[in-house]
Amino acid sequence: MKVILIKDTKDGKANTIIDVSPGYATNFLFKNKLAEPLNSRTEKLLVKRKQQIEIEKQEKQEQIAKLKIEIERLVLWFKLKGNKESVHGAITAKKIKKELEIKGIFVDKQAIQTSGISTFGTSFVDIKLSSQTIAKLKINITKDE
């Protein structure tokens, strides 16, 4: 019996067609609302669902690309106390996130890949926006008098 999976299961991912025994389909998949039987109506719905998922995926990629451009144009300025050779403190992911939010950019703290910047001058921080997209944020640290 051919069925369309509604949710991810051990048999496959959501929105895929699989072939299972009628007993398994009736007693487990349909009962737990994990799948629906394959017929012309559900097949048309599956095609529409896949198209909608593809459109949403492309829109998300476009948003990520715009966000990457916006982040890479930005320069954040921080002040740290210290003398000529040593710095007192560090710029952490939490501080970077807070400054980005002030500028209207919202990213997850775990996306900011830094272990703390503790040197004066210009540094670059990677911000992981998706599995394939990483933006480089420019950070300038000056001495606080």
UniProtKB/Swiss-Prot annotation:
Specify whether Cytoplasm is a keyword of the entry: no
Q: Does the keyword tRNA processing apply?
A: no
Q: Which GO molecular-function terms appear in the entry?
A: rRNA binding; structural constituent of ribosome
Report one GO cellular component: ribosome
Q: Pfam families of this UniProt entry?
A: Ribosomal_L9_C (PF03948), Ribosomal_L9_N (PF01281)
Listed transmembrane segments: none
* NCBIfam families per UniProt: L9
Origin species, per record, is Mesomycoplasma hyopneumoniae (strain 232) (Mycoplasma hyopneumoniae)
What is stated as this protein's family in its record? Belongs to the bacterial ribosomal protein bL9 family.
The identity of this protein, by name, is: Large ribosomal subunit protein bL9
Q: Which PANTHER family match?
A: 50S RIBOSOMAL PROTEIN L9
Keywords of the record, alphabetical order, are: Ribonucleoprotein, Ribosomal protein, RNA-binding, rRNA-binding
Mention one GO biological process in which this protein takes part, according to its record. Answer: translation
Q: Which InterPro entries match?
A: Ribosomal_bL9, Ribosomal_bL9/RNase_H1_N, Ribosomal_bL9_bac/chp, Ribosomal_bL9_C, Ribosomal_bL9_C_sf, Ribosomal_bL9_N, Ribosomal_bL9_N_sf
